[in-house]
Amino acid sequence: MMRKLLKYIFLMKNTILIFFLFATLFAKAQIPVLENYNPIWKTQSNNPSESMPLGGGDIGLNVWVEKGDLYFYFSRSGTFDEHNTLLKLGRVKVSLTPNPFKDKEGFRQELVLEDGYVSIIQNNTKIKLWVDVFKPVIHLDLDSKTTVKMTASYESWRHKNRDSKGKANNANSYKWAPQGEIVTFKDSIAFENDGVQFYHRNRQETVFDVTVKQQKMESVKDQMLNPLANLTFGGFMTGDNFKSDGTYSGKYQDTDFKGFSLSSVKPSKKQSLELHLYTNQNDINSWNTNLKNQISDYKTKGKQAEKNTIKWWNNFWNRSFIYTQKNQSTAKDSVYQIGQNYQLFRYMLGCNAYGKYPTKFNGGLFTVDPVFTNPDLNFTPDFRNWGGGTMTAQNQRLVYFPMVKSGDFDMMKSQLDYYLGLQKNAELRSQVYWKHGGAAFTEQLENFGLPNPAEYEWKRPADYDPGMEYNAWLEYEWDTVFEFCQMMLQQKEFAGEDIQKYNSFIISCLRFFDEHYQYLAKHRGRKALDGNGHLILYPGSGAETYKMANNANSTISALQVITKQLLNLSSKELSKEDSNYLKGFQTRIPPLNFRTFDGHTTLAPAKSWERINNSEVPQLYPVYPWGIYGIGKPDLETALNTWKYDTDAIKFRSHVGWKQDNIFAARLGLTNEAAKYNLLKMGNSDRRFPAFWGPGFDWVPDHNWGGSGMIGMQEMLLQESNGKIHLFPAWPKGWDVHFKLHATQNTTVEVELVNGELKVLKIIPEERKKDIINLLNKSAEEKINLK
């Protein structure tokens, strides 16, 4: 009997051992899924720099629990004041009695990515925060096993007028050159019907009027789009079981505020709070009426709101993803981190899916008190560096290009239609200043289509061209609009959308270069073109770096690619008149320029230039974004030489902020270099929420840092040329990955790579399987010779 028992114990031990061995092996082989990437915090936060993002539709929140109280800042797309500061809508503080969050043990805060909400749990009390994707409403739902009293306070630092002095003006369009005293005017805040109503209403006169006068556009002012005059934004905080409970004053971080409290009529186990937001440019009576109508409509029509919002987020995550892990690893190592941060940053982009205005590169909807970025900047939570209504094109493009391969075409409309709305104002610039056609867009662009007034420069020579920025960085940098033209064209190329509404815009941008550089040439001499019949693109600019450039390669690449893509449209999509014009224009575009380093031919920044002013690498723009050079395309070696031997390209190389070296390396098939720079780019930030990078060159969270990182990872996994889809053009064999990305011709590509082997290959439509070329572990020479 004893022998049998010992034998049984021995067998059981071995069975358990084998089970654990298999379990360990199985665990090692697993690639993370979305749920694994949910940020989960087991302790409360010290301040808003340790907050968690939340949002939906066009609303963003920073959520944190501090000293037992729940706080959140909330922001919305398009809330620009008179000076073009992107104002937050306020801060909410939630206190519970008795307080379930008073203890250190048992706290849990989680961002549930799949369903798009934040959950906070402790002592049998759960708070769920979520934002309606389809209507501008913030929800807070409390569920407790015991009755609690809730006090929800709307806190505003704009309870009074505030002077804006010195560096505080970097948050608005005046920057370092304010014209007179700049005042952030107070909001209107009051209790109404057991709720709190709050709004900011712009005056009639704004920075728009100042800029129009500065830039001598007054003759056409009445024709121009003015998005700021009388703009009114705010909302109403309310709940079924709440009553007004007085005001209080306080100071949070460096800023005094006034609080307006709502409290539970009676303690309850279930309580809900809603913040309804509304923005419009109509009169204040209409604004009030429309807000009230929106609230009453929501009571009857909003019953499916939570289900619809969850469904939207579920579809969002199913549309595209990149899940990563090192081979045979279960640790949250550097490769795991870049997969998590890819998802977290894409979530942040999804929070402004349908904003009237694009997601801002310098913080998006998730900025907090500036002292946590720079202790010398003790300004209000409205502060961000590089302005609110100023859209800097070279930064903005990196926020929106990742949406192409992630298939988020619906989310790109905010950025593309933003430009479309400014076409008239940009064309008026050409007509007023130079009496020719075309849309004249600049790099640092106000939300009304004129150059930023500080960058335009107030202290100018009297006879200086009023159409020009008097600015060493930005002068003659007109070509950055073409990357948004590229995105417009990609809506058709990738998603098959009808893009005819963009045709006149794109052609107008091309026409500006055609007519303006002939105009400049005729002012220098008798001929409008060079001896080969080409435009003389002088003075020009290679990004902000190569100044007073002659025939910058970044400009030439843009003109060549955009014109060619337009001419690929069918006769139904492009008129004969436009087609004939583009064919003629195509003959006037000059060729690219080259130079040599130690006998190696490389792409040049331009034919010539007078000085170097910044640290971009536009000599590699023919690689990205323009795709003239790359894997499967002619003369890849010249582009590789540019990476390897161009001394400026080497000197400027970095992963910080808007730097694109991770993208260039991926496009060139340089697996080791792409891995290095993407690990640096997409590794954890030094903040509690790992995708709050920055400030880099801009602000926190740096969205062009995250956007360029997303692009780099996508390009490591999937590229296209000549109708072929290249898998793993720069992906290390030792990194497991499960990804789903979008390609041209309405194609989705889903692949799972485990231990260097393809486990899943799902292509829709299936007929595109014939176009797949697997480049995993291919040598540099094999990639160069690929046709």
Regions found by a protein language model. Give the residues of each.
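Aromatic- and histidine-enriched alpha-helix N-cap/loop-to-helix transition segments
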Residues: 339-340, 390-395, 407, 475-483, ...
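Alpha-helical packing segments of well-folded alpha/beta enzyme cores
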Residues: 309, 341-344, 348, 395, ...
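Non-catalytic carbohydrate-binding regions of carbohydrate-active enzymes
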Residues: 486-520, 581-610, 629-749, 753-754
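Bacterial Sec-dependent N-terminal signal peptides
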Residues: 1-30
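Well-ordered alpha-helical scaffold segments within catalytic/enzyme domains
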Residues: 326, 347-352, 398-410, 483-496, ...
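Short, charged/polar micro-motifs that form catalytic or ligand-binding hotspots
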Residues: 21, 47, 331, 335, ...
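Aromatic-residue-lined binding/catalytic grooves and analogous aromatic/hydrophobic interfacial grooves
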Residues: 30-458, 556, 578-648, 690, ...
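The feature captures the catalytic groove of carbohydrate-active enzymes
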Residues: 367-389, 441-503, 514-584, 759
